[in-house]
Amino acid sequence: MIERVKTTKLSEASGLPKTYDPVGTENRWQKAWEEKGAFKPDPSAPGDPFSVVIPPPNVTGSLHMGHAFNTALIDTVVRYKRLKGNNVLCLPGTDHASIAVQTILERQLKEEGKNRRDLGRASFLEKAWEWKEKSGGRIVDQLKRLGYSVDWSRERFTLDEGLSKAVSEAFVRLHEKGLIYRGEYLVNWCPASGSAVSDLEVEMKEVDGHLWHFRYPLVTSSVSSAKQISYLEVATTRPETMLGDVAVAVNPSDERYKDLIGEKLTLPLVGRTIPIIGDPHVDKDFGTGCVKVTPAHDPNDFEIGQRHDLPQITVMTKKGTMNHNAGQFEGLDRFEAREAVIDSLKEIGLLTKIEAYKHSVPFSDRGKVPVEPLLSTQWFVKMDPLSSSCSEFFEKGQPKFIPNRWSKVYRDWLTDIRDWCISRQLWWGHRIPAWFVISQTDNKVVNETPYIVARTEDEAKKLAREKYGDSVKIEQDEDVLDTWFSSGLWPFSTLGWPDETHPDFQRWYPTNTLVTGFDIIFFWVARMTMMAGVFTERMPFADVYIHGLVRDEQNRKMSKSAGNGIDPLLLIERYGTDALRFALVREVAGAGQDIRLDFDRKNQTSATVEASRNFANKLWNATRFALINLEDQDYENLESYDSSKLQLSDRWILSRLARVNHETANRYENYALGEAAKGLYEFAWNDFCDWYLELIKRRLNNSENLSSDELLDRKIAKSVLYKVLSDLLIMLHPLMPHLTEELWHGLTGLDEDQFLALQPWPKSNEQDLNLDLESSFSDLFASIRLIRNLRAVAGLKPSQKVPVMLVSGKEVLQKTLTTSINDIAVLTKAKEVQILSPEQAKSLPSMKALAGVSGELEVVLPIEGLIDIASLRSRLEKDLNKAQKEIESLSGRLANKNFVDKAPKDVVEECRANLTESEAQVRLVKERLMGLD
């Protein structure tokens, strides 16, 4: 650490090129940070621990704008905490993405006319690891381009040795607690990938389909005869599943059918007799009020079947073809079978109606085909005990969601949960640590425990031999675990768990902040809290910052399918990483809000990011200006001067600096990152660059004929310049790390390995705060803007110097104006500046002048004899006439009730705003015309 004071070495302005090269600068500092281990923390180092484990991107992935947004938010928080003196660990890693990788590899094999079983498991996994090593580093390299201040030496991969050990340990412990079981249940089955898929891997798509109505004949009975009913009619979007129907359900309160409950129907095409059952979950007002029940192929039907102890008849194979239970339709693809069933029902006169029907169909995100609810023997985690534990923590406020509205979503998920299917019929992933007992020689029947769960194969063999004898043989389950199982352990497995004595676990667990999108609260955030609750008895993070989506300029969600995604690397190459990061964070209106990012596809440009690049250029040029004026180092630390010697402009900028310091730190602390970016932008661009640098230019002159007071004033100006710029760069560092690192080194002249990223946050001197002075300077700047505006109205040439009168009855403002009279004259090209009280202004002789008012200040610009008054009057009268016509037009539209009631709300509001603006314009022009009389 170094103290931020004037150093013995200072770069000349030539140390910074005239133009800013963002890509070159960023590459250089990213390399320096990593080579010097700038972000590699020591667990024993001082400072309160602060840790973040980044959401692991898929190893198959490539950088998209969501990654860039997430990175910008996380790294802003992390870099700020480092500046505040915390012992920070930001740990990176990637996810093995089992389905995604396996899909890619199987596609490659298919092109070669092979499949994974042709290779065998060992060869297939060898090929998968080769692919991962070759292609999997792309996303990491791209993340590095974003300037992530993570410890790359601690980078983890969900299939690496340590995490694999943690996964096996977690599985064994959950099984020992009775929280993992093996059972038959309906799962989302993807026929294309040949595996169960999680709910997250299912995408609901609106499909134009049909609703087919057909009849089930009643088996004749006294009840049916009395009611003169010979059939029940049902409707379905999936007629092929009727081959597995085991009942038809009606609502027991439905007067039409309640007397038929317990009667029998004949299942068409199959001939099976099935019962009519009563179930209160049937909506008697939907359709015919009769629902076909297929427990083996529909989740709702499965629940009905469980309640009524109905059989489960599966009519499809895992490849999506019809099986032997489908009778004459065996071997047909499920969609071919659909058409065949419809034709057969039509042929026997039981098809009654076909209607167009738009409905949601679940598709496999990876396989891109409709998933099939299929009965399958899988491994499950009992979720109720886990969610109950999390609910107890939640009642204590753990974790805290930012914004708070997402806590309700999290709580609702905890209270509406079903057991989690964790097995996948894949080879790439964490193989389930369970071994089936397949044979023994002592003729004892092995039925009480058909499998052994263990951490390793050796442990499994030992347990099996102890239970079944030395000759027992075991074979490991072929399936792998759902990727979300290992992801659920991410916050603590990456820190050394299950070894809770590991220095990283001891120092940085629980972690502090998780930054993620709202779309995986269900699937990742909640599973992490559940896993942490059961294994560490603590929540894995204190805060969960939920960010929104990146949308395009038309407010559409960015996605590949919509064709409106933007490649972050393209914008990085054009504008720089810092410009992109700053633009993304600055667009955040509030925590959790979506942001918009424009993009001109023809020119490959973004006005939003370009504005941030322009801001970077502004800072670059301001620092070059500072270096030119600070290179002689004839100034001291600001604290060494008598504060009474500071000019009002110095006190004003130091007051603004103190306030911005306090506000920025508070905003960073409370995740108001967008507000932090906006506040720093306004301070840097307006207060520092546009005003303070202009105000001190005349004080920085290098004349040798200066008095001792002038020399002291010059030194003070330089000291304030150094202080403000240095502190500004540090406060901006979390948002624009590369640029600020470069400029700060140029300013301080320190060695390259003394990083700004590791410096302390600047101290804020509350004694510098002076809100009255800030208010007066706001009025001062308003007067300068008004004078410039009046000069433009008068059509004065830039070289023309005219007198200016400033009228105010506010004593503090008068003092500020009087002290700054020379600055006003220079910045407005005034011949002379008079500061008058209202009483003094009244005693002035009548004159032709332009005037304007801003707050408690009136500006008068005498113009008689300087311009052609008649020409100006004519121009103003034209402006007045134009504004009055605009008022007439707008008033007419707003008086039209039909327009106000039927036009879009934003159009009406815009019309009202334009009317208000035009009315103000009329008043202003009239005032200016009066000044010419």
From Swiss-Prot:
InterPro entries: aa-tRNA-synth_I_CS, aa-tRNA-synth_Ia, Anticodon_Ia_Val, M/V/L/I-tRNA-synth_anticd-bd, Rossmann-like_a/b/a_fold, tRNA-bd_arm, tRNAsynth_Ia_anticodon-bd, Val-tRNA_synth_C_sf. It is found in: Cytoplasm. A motif ('HIGH' region) lies at residues 57-67. Its EC number is 6.1.1.9. A motif ('KMSKS' region) lies at residues 557-561. Keywords: Aminoacyl-tRNA synthetase, ATP-binding, Coiled coil, Cytoplasm, Ligase, Nucleotide-binding, Protein biosynthesis. The keyword Aminoacyl-tRNA synthetase applies. Its main location: cytoplasm. One of its GO terms (biological process) is valyl-tRNA aminoacylation. GO terms for molecular function: aminoacyl-tRNA deacylase activity; ATP binding; valine-tRNA ligase activity. GO terms for cellular component: cytosol. ATP binds at residue 560. Signal peptide: none annotated. It catalyses: tRNA(Val) + L-valine + ATP = L-valyl-tRNA(Val) + AMP + diphosphate. Residues 1-24 are annotated as: Disordered. It comes from the Bacteria. Residues 866-932 form a coiled coil. Catalyzes the attachment of valine to tRNA(Val). As ValRS can inadvertently accommodate and process structurally similar amino acids such as threonine, to avoid such errors, it has a 'posttransfer' editing activity that hydrolyzes mischarged Thr-tRNA(Val) in a tRNA-dependent manner. Belongs to the class-I aminoacyl-tRNA synthetase family. ValS type 1 subfamily. ValRS has two distinct active sites: one for aminoacylation and one for editing. The misactivated threonine is translocated from the active site to the editing site. The C-terminal coiled-coil domain is crucial for aminoacylation activity. Monomer. This is Valine--tRNA ligase. The lineage of its organism: Bacteria, Bacillati, Cyanobacteriota, Cyanophyceae, Synechococcales. The gene is valS.
